[in-house]
Amino acid sequence: EVLKLKNVQDIYMTINPELLAEMDLLDMQKGKYSHPKYCIKMATGTGKTWVMHALLIWQYLNAKNEETISGDYSKNFLFVAPGLIVYERLLDAYIGKVQENGQRDVETSDLKMFEDIFIPDPYRDEIFNFIQSAICTKEEIGRKTTGTGLLAITNWHLLVGEQETEDEISPLEDPTIAVKKEFPIRPGTSAGHTLNVLDNQYFKGKQLDFLANLKDIIVFNDEAHHLGEWQKADQILEKKWQKALSHIQKDKKNKFIQVDFSATPYNETGSGLKRQIHYFPHIITNFELKEAIKLGLVKTVAIDKRKELAALPLDFKVEREGNDIKSLSDGQRVMLRAGWSKLKILEEGFLNFDKNKHPKMLVVCEDTNVVPYVTQFLKQEGLSDDEIMEIHSNKKGEVKPDEWNEIKRRLFNLDKHKNPKVIISVLMLKEGFDVNNICVVVPLRASSSSTLLEQLIGRGLRLMWREPEFTEIKDENREKLLIKKEEPDNYLDILSVVEHPRFIEFYD
C-alpha cells in the first residue's frame, strides 16, 4: 500500500536488494510469487486472528470510503483454513460461537466482544452491516447473494473439490474408487446420490470459478505452512491448496493480495543431522514463541525432565506384531503416568486460586489405532469414562462431519467443565484447538519434526489465568523459570510437556 509492491521480489528490491543474492531467484519467478504476497510469522496463541481482523477492517473501510478508486483496496475477502477445527474457529470469530442449542450467537464473535479495540465508533454500523450481508460459509460461496462485498470462509478442500474425510486408500484396497472416477453417477437415494448431493458436487467446481471471476480479492490463509511444496523423487510439486489459489489469482495480477499466517512457515527436508529448514521467502514479520513467553502473552513452557525417561529408548512407538498393535511401549506408559501425576498436582494446586479452573491433559498419539490403548491404560490408572475424551480421525488426521458434530458439542465450553480431564487425539487437534486449560501435553510419537513439535506445543499455549490479580504471580513464575532456573511456587500459566530429554534440543 505504501511502497506499491506488485510481487514478492519487489519486497526485496525495495527494502534490501542485497538479500536477493541469498534467494532462489528462479523460484521467485513462479506464478505464486507474482502478486502482492506477505507472510506473518506469529507464535501460536499471540493473536493471529486479531491481526486478520485489523487488516480486513482497514481494507474494507478504505475500499468503501476512498474518494478516488486506487485499486489498492478490496471489499472481497476469502479466509482459507487447513481443516474443520480452524474453519470453525474462523466462523466463531466473525459470526459467534455455537451455543448449546446449536445456534451461533453473534454477540460472542471477536469483533463484537472487542469492538472497542477494533472498530472506531463512527464505523461500527458499517462494519457489522458488511459482515452480516457479506458472510458466506463454505456451503454458501457462489450461492448466497451478498451486498457490496464478500467475506467467505472455507477450508481448502472445498476449493479443490475434495471431501475432507477421504482416506488415503488405493484403488487396489477399494476398487469402487476407480469405478467412481471412470463412470458418471446418477440420481438415486439407494446409492446416496440424491439431487441435493449431486447439486453439492456440481457446485464444488463452481465455487472456485466464482472466486476466480471476482475482479479483486484478499486471501487470508490460516496455518499457511500447509501451503509449502512437497518433493516426489527429484520433482518439487505444488500442493492442491496452492494450485487452487493460483487459479483464483490467474487474471487478477496485483488485484490479488495474499496474506499467510503461521507459527511455522517453512518446509523441512532431510532428517537427523541433515535436516534443513527452508523459510518461505515472503515472511515480513517474525514474532517468536520465546518473545511471546517473555512478555507473558502465552504460557511458559516447562519440559518435564524425568530420570526414568532418560533411561528409556528414544523410540516411543507402540509394540507391534506385524501391522497389529500388541500394547503400549514401556516409554509410553511412563510418559502417561508422568502426565497424569502432573495433572493431579495442578488440580490440587489450582484449588488455592480458583476452584472453577480445571486443568486438562492432551495426549497426542502416533495414529488413531493407538487411542483405545491409551484409554484402556488410563482407566487402569484410575480414570473414569467421563474423565477421558477420545477424538478419532482418519489417516490424515481428519474427522467425519457427523462425528465432528458430536466432538464440537463436547468441546463447547470444555474449559468450564471438570470433565473430561484428558483429551486423546492424533493430528486432529494439531491446529485451531482454542482451549485455554491445556496444562499438560504428552506427545506419544517418535517424530522429531520441528514443525510438528511447535504445533503440538501450540495446543497448550493459550493463557488460562488472564485475570489481572494473577499478573504479579505469573511474572514471578517466569522470572524463576527463565532467569533464576528455579522451581516456581505454583503452576499458573505454565505448560508442562512430558518429553524425552533428547528432544529438548528442539524446544531450545
Predicted regions: what they are:
Residues 1-508:
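RecA-like P-loop NTPase motor core of helicase/translocase proteins
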